[in-house]
Amino acid sequence: MARVDWTKLNLKERVVSINRVSKVVKGGKNFRFSVTVVVGDPDKGYVGVGRGKAAEIPDAIRKAIEDAKKHLIKVPVVGTTIPHEVIGEFGAGKVLLKPAREGTGVIAGGPVRAVLESAGIRDVLSKSLGSSNATNMVYATIEGLKRLKTAEEVARLRGIPVHQLFE
């Protein structure tokens, strides 16, 4: 997949989780921070997730934002929702995403909501299954969004006209 030129996008950043981790050494405990960040351009339908690790929180956030900008994906949006139902899996985390009619809003838990809103999806139903770890939920949501295909893409892959899909 070609890398997206993020300099042309109006990216918004959201910190999803900050985790303090420790390494026990002879002299005591060394603390570091692991941060998960979601960046996205809701108007153009791009979203990315990144992780950063550092001794200080601001450094970890900066690294996570840089990582997220390197991993942007384009999300197919039909009107204000997604084209079809999909399940994204990452580790023990599963996220079920369902299209919803206009006016429903984003019905999703914290980490999943951050990804969907950053991608510009305004109407969607979701259910988190399995792991409730914020990082796993975010990556499972991204995996689900990567699997989405529009009717035009499916028709092109099958080599048939779009109207034939719905007959």
UniProtKB/Swiss-Prot annotation:
The keyword Hydrolase does not apply. It comes from the Bacteria. One of its GO terms (molecular function) is structural constituent of ribosome. The keyword Glycosyltransferase does not apply. It holds the Pfam family Ribosomal_S5. One of its GO terms (biological process) is translation. Keywords: Ribonucleoprotein, Ribosomal protein, RNA-binding, rRNA-binding. GO terms for cellular component: small ribosomal subunit. Residues 11-75 form the S5 DRBM domain. With S4 and S12 plays an important role in translational accuracy. Located at the back of the 30S subunit body where it stabilizes the conformation of the head with respect to the body. Part of the 30S ribosomal subunit. Contacts proteins S4 and S8. The N-terminal domain interacts with the head of the 30S subunit; the C-terminal domain interacts with the body and contacts protein S4. The interaction surface between S4 and S5 is involved in control of translational fidelity. Belongs to the universal ribosomal protein uS5 family. This is Small ribosomal subunit protein uS5. The lineage of its organism: Bacteria, Bacillati, Bacillota, Clostridia, Thermoanaerobacterales. The gene is rpsE.
